[in-house]
């Protein structure tokens, strides 16, 4: 099995391990290295969320540091496009969760659809665990202080 990495897992990894003042590139690199035993991918929606962080950075230095982290990450973890098959899975999940009155944010739905389409688990941060657990037939792994 592989793992689809959600933005919340990347944020949690950085908060758990980043030394004050660090750019975080080494932190993400060490953490992603732990996933070497299985394939890991980033959904296109996660890549988009990361790029928003670059574009909304309050200084050019911070924008450059964020872009460097993303570039380092995507050298080791490929981005999976949101193509027709994943879009259909997204629609199935939307319909299911909508009928149950348990919709989750659209980007997180795209992450879940990517994981289900690939037959992968999804790695999330503690902040997003509850709503990912609403998704049927999705193996949710939560990044904690233990790794």
Language model features with spans:
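Short, hinge-like loop/turn segments at secondary-structure boundaries
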Residues: 58-61, 97-98, 139-143
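Acidic, PIN/NYN-like endoribonuclease modules and their adjacent C-terminal/linker elements
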Residues: 112, 116-147
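A generic structural signal for short hydrophobic patches within well-formed alpha-helices
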Residues: 10, 47-50, 87, 129-132
């Amino acid at each position: 099995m592989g793992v689809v990495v959600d933005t919340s897992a990347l944020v949690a990894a950085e908060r758990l391990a980043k030394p004050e003042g660090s750019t975080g590139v080494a932190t993400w690199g060490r953490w992603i290295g732990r996933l070497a035993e299985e394939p890991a991918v980033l959904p296109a929606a996660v890549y988009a969320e990361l790029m928003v962080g670059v574009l909304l950075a309050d200084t050019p230095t911070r924008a450059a540091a964020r872009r460097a982290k993303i570039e380092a990450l995507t050298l080791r973890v490929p981005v999976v496009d949101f193509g027709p098959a994943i879009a259909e899975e997204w629609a199935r999940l939307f319909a299911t969760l909508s009928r149950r009155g348990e919709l989750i944010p659209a980007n997180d739905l795209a992450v879940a659809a990517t994981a289900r389409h690939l037959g992968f688990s999804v790695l999330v941060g503690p902040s997003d665990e509850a709503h990912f657990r609403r998704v049927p037939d999705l193996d949710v792994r939560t990044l904690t202080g233990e790794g």
